[in-house]
From Swiss-Prot:
Keyword Ubl conjugation among UniProt keywords: no
EC primary class: oxidoreductase
Gene Ontology molecular function terms on file: oxidoreductase activity
Organism: Bos taurus (Bovine)
Family: Belongs to the short-chain dehydrogenases/reductases (SDR) family.
Stored PANTHER family: DEHYDROGENASE/REDUCTASE SDR FAMILY MEMBER 12 (PTHR44656), DEHYDROGENASE_REDUCTASE SDR FAMILY MEMBER 12 (PTHR44656:SF7)
Keywords noted in UniProt: NAD, NADP, Oxidoreductase
Identification of the protein by name: Dehydrogenase/reductase SDR family member 12
Entries under InterPro entries matching the protein: NAD(P)-bd_dom_sf (IPR036291), SDR_fam (IPR002347), SDR_member_12 (IPR052992)
Binding site for NAD(+): 50, 52, 201, 205, 234
Top-level taxon of origin: Eukaryota
Length: 317
């Protein structure tokens, strides 16, 4: 079944996830959707020092938004902050150094953040794909700790902050790779199965889709969404998937093309006309399962994921 899912996904990707797929989809975009200015609104972008995150932060800054960059690497983050200020002319760019794979650090960060700042939009962009099983200092598998638990803790902690503001939104940068994975709650940290970093990443992205749907039902005052940016030429892809990067080459999307739907979901009034909790691709809701792929999960399986995350979030608070 995994072989079928992977083949179907790759064929779909060649049609839709490439640069040519973006160019085709963009013919249906409403050009004025992103002709907005957002002074007075505050945006948090995790992983904002490179790739899609930096492209997103740059465009928000150019439109007058206050941007909070949440990054792990201080030196690279300082460089990104300086570049964004220089190119946008916007001084309201703040830098926060946080390792999202360490939930205690995330809880502490939010506790301090909410004492000084407001927030309208959270963009969960940061992620990692570690190809050999690696544990954090808390003993958690690093991909899961960053991509799933980190997103869960940060979003959960910030929901009360977001609910106080006008037009609050949460956008999570997922991946079309999640289409090859059924939600797995029996071994979420890959302790009992052969480790494949690409499949672990895809599983994390499936978990993000489930979380988005759950949050949307639980918190109707906030517009939640997740999205697939397409196959994008980013530093992360070059580092973690060198073979894939070499194979696709010039067919990969630019960082700006990858960031387009993130920006649309974060900025456009039209985005909140769509139901909360959806998965988006190129500014449109997209299916979360491939035909005949048997990747649907039961409510009990989804509840088990929440229970696992809640227990870990409490343990490391």
């Amino acid at each position: 079944m995994l072989l079928y899912r992977s083949a179907a996904w790759f064929a779909k990707g060649l049609r839709e996830y490439t640069k040519s797929g973006y160019e085709s989809a963009s013919k249906d975009f409403v050009p004025d959707d992103l002709e907005v200015q957002v002074p007075g609104r505050a945006f948090m972008v995790t992983g904002g020092n490179s790739g899609i995150g930096k492209a997103t932060a740059m465009e928000i800054a150019k439109r007058g938004g206050t941007v909070h960059l949440v990054c792990r690497d201080h030196s690279r983050a300082e460089g990104a902050k300086a570049e964004i200020i220089r190119e946008s002319g916007n001084q309201n760019i703040f830098l926060h150094i946080v390792d999202l794979s360490l939930p205690k650090s995330v809880w502490k960060f939010v506790e301090n953040f909410k004492q000084e700042h407001t927030l309208n939009v959270l963009i969960n962009n940061a992620g990692c794909m570690v190809n050999k099983r690696e544990l954090t200092e808390d003993g958690l598998e690093k991909n899961f700790a960053t991509n799933t638990l980190g997103v869960y803790v940060l979003t959960t902690a910030l929901i009360p902050v977001l609910e106080k503001e006008h037009d609050p939104r949460v956008i999570t940068v997922s991946s079309g790779g999640m289409l090859v994975q059924k939600l797995n709650t029996d071994d979420p940290q890959s302790e009992r199965t052969a480790f494949d970093g690409t499949m672990v990443y895809a599983q994390n992205k499936r978990q993000q889709v489930v979380l988005t749907e759950r949050w949307a039902r639980a918190h109707p005052a906030i517009h939640f969404s997740c999205m697939h940016p397409g196959w994008v030429d980013t530093p992360g892809v070059r580092l973690s998937m060198p073979g894939f990067h070499a194979r696709l080459g010039a067919r990969l999307r630019s960082e700006a093309q990858g960031a387009d739907t993130v920006l649309w979901l974060a900025l456009a009034p039209a985005a909140t006309a769509q139901p909360s909790g959806c998965f988006f691709q190129d500014r449109k809701p997209a299916p979360t399962h491939l035909p005949l792929a048997r990747t649907s999960s039961s409510p009990a399986e989804e509840e088990k994921l929440i229970e696992i995350l809640e227990e870990l979030a409490r343990r490391f608070k």
